[in-house]
Amino acid sequence: MTLLGQDRFEDAARIALGDGVDAALVLAFHSAGGLTRFASSQIHQNTWRETVAISVMAVVDGNRVGVAAGSSLEPDAVRSTLQAAKAIAAVTPANPDFPGLAGPASYPAANLWDDATAETTPAERADGVARALEEFPSNIDAAGYIETTANEVFIAGSTGLRAYATSTQAGCSVMAIAQNSSGFAESVERKLGALDVPVLAERAVKKAELGRDPADVEPGAYTVILEPAATSTLLQFLAFLGFGGKAFLEGRSFMTGKIGEKIMEQKITIVDDPIASDALGLPFDFEGTPSSRVVLIDKGVAKDVVWDRTTAKKAGRESTGHGLPPPNTMGPLPLNLRMEPGDQSLEQLVASTDRGLLVTRFHYSNVVSEKETVLTGMTRDGTFAIEDGKLARGVKNLRFTQNAVEALSNVEGVGDTTETSTELFFGGSRAPAIKVRDFKFSSATTH
């Protein structure tokens, strides 16, 4: 991808921050990337997309705010976007909670860019697919994708705020599909070269082979080993349900009234850290506030939630750098959650379990009860019975209906390695495998 560069965004900002408003904020993106899909053990699609987006927030009469979006940085298009934002602001009721715009700031250093990933060709992604296919026997089909993306983000405010960052990302997902079983593995990194595609393929194939002819299993409460992808599903839903300042202030969060109290097992520490070396975040949020590391759960104790400028003003706090793009009705969200690893390997977690289930990942997950953090969803791509400390056989998929906070209160072991998942939200979560007692499955399937 050829970068537009900060100067190109500055040209657009000079127009968007024009006269006729009390204050203005410009948020612009440039993203480009390639995707190589494969199914039935062959490549069936190569795509390339490149997008430009710009959002202009106009403020009139002190606290009447309008936001308009466009898809071009050309001068006439930017002027049109500004005029639309001004027109919206003119008919929008005053917002007494508007905190004003962020001012200039310095941002933490972050190494987010990799030239080789930004310049990846379809042939290079195809080579990765070929290396994955080498791990597949003839009686198991391969499916999945390899994707590489490069991004620019720019923020400018009439306060003098300027923020600019470039980043790359590479992801690989591999499914192994047998006659009546399947396996799955994935990896997301900053650099394409950090993806070990053959290892992912090998993991997926082993799951499909072990899962052949899955046995029936009764619903009920089980000791489960959740692999990192399944753990991440719980984390990402908790981000949405209660780790944000708006839900906290409105009393919808499981953290409301619990700060300083033990609400999870002591083995559980959860932080949001956008600028960790293995995270996928940015050094600033979409309001231009510097990103910061926030400890949410510390050894089972509720410590804090994340804040943007609006919720921080209401709470008498400082923004933690977790604002979303305007217009934002959700409030702040932690988009780079991580559960700190423990001291047991996945093999040790399994070996310590007399009877239970191992879950590779969940899908079709959703919220049953927001305040109680009850979730439901299905197991997928590798659910196995554990007997006498060993994986005994594949079992048919199950529906879980489980209080997520309760599950993290019942953790008996935490894996010593973490993996990144990007299933639900922009950003991602990094989590280990966990061993949970009394995890509730409400129904079984026939496959």
Q: Each predicted region: which residue ranges?
A:
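N-terminal small-residue-enriched
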Residues: M1-H447
